[in-house]
Amino acid sequence: MQRVWFNKTFSSVGAAIRLIREADQASEYEIVCSSTNAHAPVFLAAHESALEPGGLKGLDYLEWCLDFCLAHRIGIFIPGKEAALISGEQARFEAQGTRVLCVASQDTLDLLHNKARFYETVVCSTPPAAFRLVETAQQFEAAWHELKKDHAQLCIKPSVSVYGLGFAVIDEERSSAQLLLQGVQYHIGLEDLRRGFEAMETFRPMLLMEYLDGHEFSVDCLGDNGRLVCAVARKKSLVVGQGQLIDLRDDILEATRQLTETYGLNGIFNVQFREGQSGLGLLEINPRMSGGIGMACLAGPNLPYLALLGFDRGFDTLVVPEVRAGLRVGEIAFAMEMP
C-alpha cells in the first residue's frame, strides 16, 4: 500500500481525498493529511491526520516536510503549502524514497503566482484582458486614461493574490460609501481609490484591467508534464442559485491545451476564463485543485484519483471516462461534527 501525503493546503483537498477513497476500491492508497488547524474538517476524510507546527515557512518548512516523509513512510507527496520551494527540491525527497507530485517546476510556479509576470508570457488563442501594472498614483492615472480609450469599464486587483482578494470593479459614479450602503460587493469608487493611492508614495503591484463582465469558465484539468489528459469546463451562471453547466467549448479546450503545453503543467490544476466585450479572456492558471473539483468530477472523470494513479503508474495506462457535456452541477452545504 502506498502512503500518500497532502500537507496544509486549500479546503478543496477534503473533496479530493474523498474522491480518491471512493475510487480506490482495492485500498491501494493510504491517505495522510496535515494542517496547522487541529479542527480541520479534512481530517475526517483521510485515513490518518497530523498537526503541523505553526509559523514554519521557507527552508524551515522544507526540512520539516523531509523529516515528516521519512518518519511517516510517505511514498507520494502532493504539496500545497510551499509547493514551489518543494518542487525545486524533489531530488532530496526522492533520495529518501518519496516521489513528489508537482504541478510545475519551481520557476513556473513562482511565475503563475505573479499575474503581471505571467500575463506578459502568455501566448495562446485566448489572451488575458488588456492590463497595466501600477505601483504609484501617477502610474494609475496614466494607465486609467490609456485603457479607458478602448474599454468602457475597468477593474483592479493585486498582481499576487488568491481567492480574488483585493479585486474590485471601479465605479465612476458612486463613492465607496454609497456602494457600501447599497450592498454592492467587489466595487470601489474611482475618486476614493484615487485619493487612497495619492496618500501613498508607492503601493504593492496592482493590475488595472479591462473588466470582463460575461460568463466565467472554470476548467479543472489533468496534465502529464505538458500534455493535457483531460479537461472539464464549468460555465458559471450569472444568476445565483442556478448552478454551473459542464460546457466543453472548443476554444476553451484548445486554449487550455496550449497553456498546458507551454507551461509544462502536470497533475491537477485549474484554468479560468471569462467572456468580455471582445470575446473570451484568460484570467489565471491556478496550480492546484479548484474549490469546485467535486462538481467537475460529477461529469465523469475522477480527476484526483486519475492524477494519483497516472503519477504512480503512468498516464498512458489510464482509462479516462468521457466528460458528460451539458450536465448542470452544484453544491449544497451540510452540518457536520468537527474533529
Where are these regions (language model features)?
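ATP-binding N-terminal substructure of ATP-dependent carboxylate-amine bond-forming enzymes
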Residues: 1-104
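Residues that mark the start of a beta-strand
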Residues: 1-5, 153, 207
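ATP-dependent carboxylate activation and anion-phosphoryl transfer catalytic cores
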Residues: 7, 237-240, 244-339
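Short, charged, surface-exposed secondary-structure boundary motifs
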Residues: 42-44, 59-63, 108-116, 164-166, ...
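Residue-level detector of structured alpha->beta connecting loops
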Residues: 73, 151-152, 264
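Active-site nucleotide/adenylate-binding loops and adjacent lid/helix of ATP-dependent enzymes
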Residues: 109-206, 225
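Phosphate-binding site of ATP-dependent enzymes
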Residues: 180-259, 263, 274-275, 279-281
